[in-house]
């Protein structure tokens, strides 16, 4: 989500600098939104056949690849709206797909306090979104560069969160054996 907020904060500047009108900029959000929805519904379907713990590492890999791809497009090419939207839409698809798994995993240990756990999860998520937007806003004089740097930096944060959660699950599994 922090990546979305980073992009939403800077995209009017980025796309405006590329010569796009406000209408074009507004319409450009349709594709990532559709990708997010497709990812979410596809995940629900996939979870009927594949366990979330099997699917999530692949989704994280795709997320990291999309962030690297977006960074490369932005820094090593003359980016266009289409070349920026391709990795961004992949990121949106993967975010939509991973969201149900991540939220379920976050709430699972707190079945008796799910309301409080959901509030904490939302607070952490929105806090990271705020931080991403804040960093982009602080360096908005170079909107594309700071945006893709913040978005790329979200990949190790996501991996760290996964590794912490995974280590806890493995440790609990060893204790109960």
Descriptions of predicted regions:
Residues 1-30, 36-37:
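Extracytoplasmic gate region of multi-pass secondary transporters
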Residues 1-9, 96, 126, 130:
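Recurrent gating helices in multi-pass secondary carriers
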Residues 33-41, 130:
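Residue-level signature of mid-helix packing/kink "hotspots" within the transmembrane helices
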Residues 54-101:
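C-terminal transmembrane helical hairpin of 12-TM major facilitator-type secondary transporters
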Residues 149-177:
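Multi-pass alpha-helical transporter architecture, strongest
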């Amino acid at each position: 989500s922090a990546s979305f907020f980073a992009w939403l904060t800077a995209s009017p500047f980025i796309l405006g600098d590329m010569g796009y009108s406000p209408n074009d900029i507004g319409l450009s959000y349709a594709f990532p939104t559709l990708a997010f929805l497709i990812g979410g519904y596809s995940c629900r379907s996939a979870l009927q056949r594949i366990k979330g713990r099997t699917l999530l590492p692949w989704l994280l890999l795709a997320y990291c690849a999309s962030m690297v791809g977006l960074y490369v497009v932005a820094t090593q090419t003359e980016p266009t709206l289409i070349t920026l939207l391709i990795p961004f839409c992949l990121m949106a698809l993967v975010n939509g797909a991973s969201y149900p798994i991540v939220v379920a995993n976050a709430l699972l240990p707190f079945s008796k306090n799910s309301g409080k756990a959901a509030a904490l999860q939302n607070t952490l998520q929105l806090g990271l979104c705020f931080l991403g937007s804040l960093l982009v806003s602080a360096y908005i004089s170079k909107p594309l560069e700071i945006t893709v740097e913040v978005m790329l930096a979200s990949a190790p944060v996501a991996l760290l969160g996964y590794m912490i959660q995974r280590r806890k699950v493995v440790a609990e599994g060893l204790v109960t054996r």
